[in-house]
Amino acid sequence: MTTPDNAAAPPDGPQAPAGPGPAGWAAEVAEIERRRELGRAMGGPGKVARQREAGRLTVRERIEQLADPGSFAEIGALTGFGAYDRDGRLTSLLPANFVAGTARISGRAVMLGADDFTVRGGSGDAAIHAKQVFSEEYAGQMRLPVVRLLDGQSGGGSVKMALRAGATYVPVNPAWDAVIDNLSLVPVVAACLGPTVGLGAARLVMSHLAVMAAGVGQLFTAGPPVVRGGTGEDLTKEELGGAAVHRRNGTIERFTATEEEAFAVIRAFLSYLPGSVHELPPVLAGADDPGRREESLVTAVPRDPRQPYRIAPVLEAIFDRGSVFPYAEYGGSMVTALARLDGHPVGVLATDPYRGTTMSAQGAQAMTRLVDLCETFHLPIVSLTDQGGMTVGRVAEERGTIRFGARAITAIYQARVPQAELILRRVYGVGGAGIVNRHRAARSWAWPSGDWGSLPMRGGIEAAFRAELEQAADPAAELERLRRELGAITSPFRTAERFGVQDLIDPRDSRPLLCAWVRDAYRVLPEQVGRPAFGTRP
């Protein structure tokens, strides 16, 4: 075991008396504090300096910045590897490279666990796995949200472990049964704040929200030296697992510029969720008028169906001001978010027309993640629908879009939480049909800009009437006639006459209607408190 540069100086006189003397247990109490102080020194001044030179906070600084002041109560503060002289006195202490304890984040109790990279890079030869196991099990038993701050191997194996043991071993992922169970029990958030590899990488993605501090954190199954030996690729940590690699692949939900911003994302995310599945989401006192009617919504969607519009102002106009929390950044045109309606947390599905309106494989993954999150923690789902169906083309087929899309639709149909829909524009095909479960009595409103069908009417005329157009004396004139005829029947008023949509509304009424709906939705949520009908998967 490497000797840390915070080696303990032997105390004057006996380290601890054999039993209680005239002074009581004062010597032992002093020894407890001395060992705690050695643990707080982490890997020692040299290793701490290198951590800071790399632009990363230390494990203690991270805990101090994330947790409410004075709220962190460490568990296993004396855990580590002690060296003793012949008289049984402690001469040095290498603290375990995982710091854990209960804390409060914005007043809420959590289980907070953080890797200490200054002690052997977080590798298993400086880990005491029982501490990590206890933290996950305790969180589940006490129904505490789990927050993991990851930096290094998170207790994963190393060559030095095998050398020290004198034999190899069949690997076991520490506390993995509890890690999996907690996903269906309590909110789990993980932050990538350094080179997160192996077991650490797996612990990152076993969460409801994974955050990466770009330029500070990297994520990979194996680091550059192992990759170089295994595949011949000579890559830096950033090239192998930096933000540019993971921004679109569905591994990490949110990216931040700094560690401090990552902590802000964690605080915000937890504020929408209950402490466990046995509670309801926290409802805040209304800071925004539920009857607010925004004039901008009347002109939000252009009359020209080919002209895109900005979805962010629409979200801000409908949901409580400042409450929209972007969820998965990798969804492409699929917008996933958490927000509040009259103080009530909800999940939000929408589309960014500037990035397209069809459901890609990545968008379907983002949708599945959000819907499963809402089902697990009892958040009603609101869809602002402008869905042009599944993405088409060779690239879409190569990526298995229909498989991911069907999985997303299955998540919607399996979700028991109340669902509501505002149809802003398009509802086409399988993708549009599955954005909400229309087999349920889900409340739905449509704006006058609504346009729906099995496929876009504008592009389907040529295919449906190809023979007639080929035989026409003037194909262009015949095409225009067909467009006028079909244009009349695509009016949303025709659909409303047949109750094909429940109601056409003034877009300015969207927020008042949804705020009234969400109060009804929260009345039925107590019936769903408890574990979800199916286990949550990462």
Where are these regions (language model features)?
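Ligand-binding clefts of soluble mixed alpha/beta catalytic domains
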Residues: 2-538
